[in-house]
Amino acid sequence: MSYPAHVTDTVYRYDGTFQGFLCCIFESYSRKEIPAAVCAHDRGQISFYDSCEIVTDPARAQRVARGLERLGPTVKERITTGFLSDDPEHELILLRFARICFEKGPAAARATGDPDICAAFDLERAVNNEACKYIEFIRFEQRDMMLGTVIHPKNRILPLLRGHFCSRLPDEDFMIFDATHGIAMLRRNRKVQYMVMEHYDKNTGQEELDWQKLWKRFFDAVTIEQRRNERCQMTHAPKRYWKDMCEMALLGRGTAGKAKQNAKAAR
């Protein structure tokens, strides 16, 4: 889709915050240009292009945020959700998407035949899909008078997990640690905060291990060996999630599998 702006060889560098990204959109709009790339400072990418430092200005960010509100929930959610992506080009994709929607109106978000619109749609879908998977597969353990767990997502999905688990566990304190990005979501006394965290020590107490063993035993007990289909299982629960699911640990594949092996040996 054509832009009322020229594509430059300039790289926008910003502080990595969502407010800072909104300021990148503002800068692009005011300069009537599309940058060659948009990079957060902490990524430290080497580029042969000229760089433009984008200073985070809350007033400018608020103006862009109000503009996104006027464009409607589809455009706004695609940008806010897509920003959680770990795709190295997600900022540029979303900036181009925002420019199109500001110029053409909210209906442009449905023009998925356009490569820029389609790329933004794919970002949002990938982030939402991963969040939905983790909502299904997260396994909490009891620790320090609260529930805790560690996950290894590709994208920064903690904000998308917040609503579900706060609603599902209204009276519980809990922590979800994103080991990939070193961020934890802590809910305590019905208040949620995000904090930088380097390491999560799993509960190795005997009581917790006994509960996990019972869950593994249940998982094995309900397995129907004649209908075991690991290819289908991996379609619904991809292997990359298994290390965070206690029933899928190597020790958890035991009871039914051993019974099958024993039956074969008996023959």
Q: Could you describe each region identified by the protein language model?
A:
Residues 173, 184-191, 203-267:
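Long, compositionally biased intrinsically disordered terminal regions
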Residues 106-199:
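Internal, well-folded beta-alpha domain core
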Residues 2-59:
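N-terminal ordered "arm"
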Residues 53-60, 191-204:
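Acidic, Ser/Thr-rich peripheral helices and adjacent loops at domain boundaries
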Residues 39-132:
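Charged, alpha-helical interface segments at or near domain boundaries
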Residues 78-82, 179, 228-234:
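Short coil/turn segments at secondary-structure boundaries
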Residues 1-7, 262-267:
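Short, low-complexity, intrinsically disordered N-terminal peptides in bacterial proteins
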Residues 20-31, 95-103, 163-167, 213-220:
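Short, hydrophobic/amphipathic alpha-helical patches that form generic packing surfaces
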